[in-house]
């Protein structure tokens, strides 16, 4: 896992300034850990209207992105990367993006992301060029740009040196298959609500135990499906039972 180059084929390259100019991803770009290059299919059209879409065969609403501009943009991206980059199409038909999948993508040296628009892209392009399809959820968006940015952000967090604290990525939600624990900062008391005493104790073993218990409890209450696919250790089962007893007694 090292530096990452991401080429994005998109009709709206300006949107990716959210990645290159703000936050952790911007810092990664400035540090040379991340490179994001956009390719606009409109630049590969030959008609005066720069047409990138057409009506779907068989009828129906909306328009479909044409093969040729996408293919030409992909050729340019491949030539520029100089590597066998994995081509990913952000699509509601794709597998749901998980933290485990993000870890796998973070091992790549380069990625090419296809951000579709309209009703989607011509299926023949997908069959000929796309290695993987990924979805960020079971809902409809106007295009693939936002999912592409989600993927880039998630992968960037795993690049060595991208985060300010070496443990931050390891402690994120989903990293170990659980939701994150609650977090608090100053002041210790706000509107008569106190920070849990254990976090002020300075006892790191007790703090780690409390955080794991909270993570297990939150996951049980909010995303029980995550626990179904995770084998709990004896200590984790004990902590979860303790959490549930404390919740029921409160």
Curated annotation (Swiss-Prot):
Catalysed conversion reaction: guanosine(37) in tRNA + S-adenosyl-L-methionine = N(1)-methylguanosine(37) in tRNA + S-adenosyl-L-homocysteine + H(+)
Protein's GO biological process: tRNA N1-guanine methylation
Pfam families xref list: tRNA_m1G_MT
Disulfide bond annotation, renumbered to this chain: none
Keywords: Cytoplasm, Methyltransferase, S-adenosyl-L-methionine, Transferase, tRNA processing
GO CC annotations on file: cytosol
GO molecular function: tRNA (guanine(37)-N1)-methyltransferase activity
EC number: 2.1.1.228
Plastid in keyword set: no
Cell compartments where the protein resides: Cytoplasm
Residues engaged in binding S-adenosyl-L-methionine: 116, 136-141
Enzyme superclass (EC): transferase
Family in the record: Belongs to the RNA methyltransferase TrmD family.
Binding partners and assembly: Homodimer.
Task of the protein: Specifically methylates guanosine-37 in various tRNAs.
UniProt name for this protein: tRNA (guanine-N(1)-)-methyltransferase
Organism: Pseudomonas putida (strain ATCC 700007 / DSM 6899 / JCM 31910 / BCRC 17059 / LMG 24140 / F1)
């Amino acid at each position: 896992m090292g530096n990452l180059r991401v080429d994005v084929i998109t009709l709206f390259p300006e949107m990716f300034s959210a990645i290159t100019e703000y936050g952790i991803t911007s810092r990664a770009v400035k540090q040379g850990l991340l490179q994001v290059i956009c390719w606009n299919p409109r630049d590969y059209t030959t008609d005066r209207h720069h047409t990138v879409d057409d009506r779907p065969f068989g009828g129906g609403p909306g328009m479909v992105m044409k093969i040729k501009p996408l293919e030409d943009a992909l050729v340019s991206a491949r030539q520029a990367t100089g590597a066998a980059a994995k081509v990913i199409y952000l699509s509601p038909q794709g597998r749901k993006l998980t933290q485990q999948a993000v870890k796998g993508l973070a091992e790549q040296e380069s990625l090419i992301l296809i951000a579709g628009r309209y009703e989607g892209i011509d299926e023949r392009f997908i069959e000929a060029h796309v290695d993987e399809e990924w979805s960020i959820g079971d809902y409809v968006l106007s295009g693939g740009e936002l999912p592409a940015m989600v993927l880039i952000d998630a992968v960037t967090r795993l690049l060595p040196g991208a985060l300010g604290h070496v443990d931050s990525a390891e402690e994120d939600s989903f990293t170990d298959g659980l939701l994150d624990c609650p977090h608090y900062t100053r002041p210790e008391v706000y509107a008569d609500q106190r920070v849990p005493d254990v976090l002020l104790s300075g006892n790191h073993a007790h703090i780690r135990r409390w955080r794991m218990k909270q993570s297990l409890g939150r996951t049980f209450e909010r995303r029980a499906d995550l626990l179904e696919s995770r084998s709990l250790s004896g200590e984790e089962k004990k902590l979860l039972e303790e959490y549930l007893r404390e919740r029921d007694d409160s």
